[in-house]
């Protein structure tokens, strides 16, 4: 991309998005002023209301799925009935509807060679004090906290010819995370920047060439977006992509749980937590993908660069030595007769300078007179390349024209350190996504999900001995699975403006039975340009 394009992108973000952003920040600041100041990260005694969290959560669930839709219907004009026509795969009932005249702030040109759009996403979260017998350097703070994250993106693209396009996105991310993003395997906000020291200046998010090779003459309709500008594609085709992108753009995609702008926001609800996919701390890698698509199935492969260190911003530019391989098979066939569904099978292998938990534990235990300050350190090793591998299953099934069920399962070998995504070695997630057309609010949607995360035995021992991962480290560990319930309701306010209250309940945060449970309410404001 030329310097002139970068300058134009930055100016557009500043001139168009900035006034709206400042108004939203004012709203968040007013809401925050009604709460007490943020506390320190000390130990909090167990409150007497802990036993009542479960019934309170049940009441909140009932409220969200019964009262909020009715309120939304009263506050806005009813929309037209949902169009559930599909070209391939399941109906994306929880996705933004295709009527772009009301979905975005400004209309998108459907027949143009060019693409220009944008988005701004703000997520405000807080949590009250929760019980914690102790806290460590990488714990979720047990006292009251509040934080607001933001992500703004300018999407641009140009179709070079009938089979090739160039896609370039400029992004800006900032704000803050609860406890700077530490203490949870299933973090409550996927939009947070995991390294608070990164520059707040706009950066290149995506920049790639997309090439399509036709393998059949018949065509299928394609919905234009920032990832593909084509109006139609060959039914049987090979798609190649080269450049900078995020692997979840093309792998482990789920129509119910993959998008923090309209759907869930927990890390392990929107993505497979055990998929330690190649990425820098902002979630992007450099590499290539190959995607073969046929009538009711597809197979894709991706090769991407890995970071230098866990959660690092710099990638290792030696793909013959440090790299990640990803494979996914997709079958577009439902398990319920006459209802559409999809099953996706994922496998991956990473090669990087990763430490081994067992080696760190042995090194720690071999000290003849360990001091209280001595803890195992999985990063204390010479440069070497180790292998990490895992697999995942991604399932979605239409139940009605307005309701879709989803499930994910993931596993990795758990021997090498968690390196690029989060500290999960096994995960299971299930949930429901509903389209607001069910209650005559076509652009609204709602969802509920349950996630259960776990780590391997060596990983448990490492944390119990006081070791620190790049996200977890309470100084000790009374191990238990980290179980999460998440609900949300996204309401369309006007044109491209959406708001979404949400709630997450987390048992055994950071896999520690000596801490929690914790309740995290949230409020999301989203603008589509």
Spans of features found by a protein language model:
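Residues that define the transmembrane beta-barrel architecture of outer-membrane proteins
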Residues: 112, 146-152, 200-205, 282-286, ...
């Amino acid at each position: 991309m030329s310097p002139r394009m970068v300058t134009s992108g930055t100016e557009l973000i500043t001139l168009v998005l900035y006034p709206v952003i400042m108004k939203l920040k004012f709203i968040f600041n007013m809401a925050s002023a009604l709460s007490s100041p943020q506390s320190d990260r000390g130990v909090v005694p167990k409150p007497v209301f802990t036993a009542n969290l479960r019934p309170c959560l049940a009441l909140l669930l009932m409220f969200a799925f019964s009262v909020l839709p009715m309120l939304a219907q009263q506050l806005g004009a009813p929309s037209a009935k949902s169009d559930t026509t599909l070209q391939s795969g399941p109906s994306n009932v929880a996705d933004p509807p295709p009527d772009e005249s009301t979905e975005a702030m400004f209309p998108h040109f459907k027949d143009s060679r060019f693409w220009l759009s944008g988005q701004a996403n703000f997520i405000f979260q807080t949590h009250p004090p929760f019980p914690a017998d102790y806290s460590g350097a990488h714990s979720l703070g047990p006292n009251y906290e509040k934080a607001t994250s933001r992500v703004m993106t300018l999407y641009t693209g140009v179709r070079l010819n009938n089979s090739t396009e160039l896609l370039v996105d400029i992004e800006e991310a900032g704000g803050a995370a609860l406890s700077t993003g530490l203490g949870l395997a299933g973090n409550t906000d996927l939009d947070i920047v995991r390294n608070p020291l990164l520059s707040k200046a706009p950066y290149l998010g995506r920049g790639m060439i997309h090439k399509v090779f036709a393998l059949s003459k018949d065509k299928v309709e394609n919905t234009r977006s920032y990832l593909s500008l084509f109006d139609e594609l060959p039914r049987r085709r090979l798609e190649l992509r080269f450049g900078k992108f995020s692997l979840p753009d093309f792998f482990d995609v789920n129509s119910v749980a993959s998008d923090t702008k309209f759907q869930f926001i927990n890390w392990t609800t929107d993505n497979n937590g055990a998929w330690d996919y190649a990425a820098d701390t902002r979630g992007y890698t450099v590499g290539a993908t190959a995607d073969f698509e046929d009538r009711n199935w597809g197979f894709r492969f991706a090769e991407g660069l890995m970071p230098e260190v866990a959660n690092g911003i710099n990638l290792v530019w030696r793909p013959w030595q440090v790299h990640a391989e990803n494979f996914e098979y997709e079958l577009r066939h439902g398990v319920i007769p006459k209802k559409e569904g999809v099953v996706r099978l994922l496998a991956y292998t990473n090669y990087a300078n990763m430490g081994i938990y067992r080696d760190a534990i042995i090194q720690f235990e071999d000290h003849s007179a360990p001091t209280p300050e001595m803890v195992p350190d999985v990063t204390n090793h010479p440069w070497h390349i180790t292998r990490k591998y895992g697999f995942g299953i991604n399932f979605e099934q239409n139940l009605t024209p307005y309701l879709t069920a989803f499930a994910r399962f993931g596993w990795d070998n758990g021997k090498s350190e968690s390196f690029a995504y989060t500290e999960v070695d096994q995960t299971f997630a299930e949930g429901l996504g509903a389209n607001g057309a069910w209650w005559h609010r076509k652009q609204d949607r709602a969802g509920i999900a349950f996630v259960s995360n776990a780590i391997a035995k060596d990983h448990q021992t490492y944390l119990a001995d006081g070791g620190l991962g790049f996200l977890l480290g309470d100084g000790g560990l009374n191990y238990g699975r980290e179980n999460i319930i998440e609900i949300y309701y996204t309401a369309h306010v006007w044109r491209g403006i959406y708001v979404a209250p949400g709630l997450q309940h987390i048992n055994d945060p950071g896999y520690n039975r000596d801490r929690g449970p914790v309740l995290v309410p949230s409020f999301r404001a989203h603008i589509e340009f």
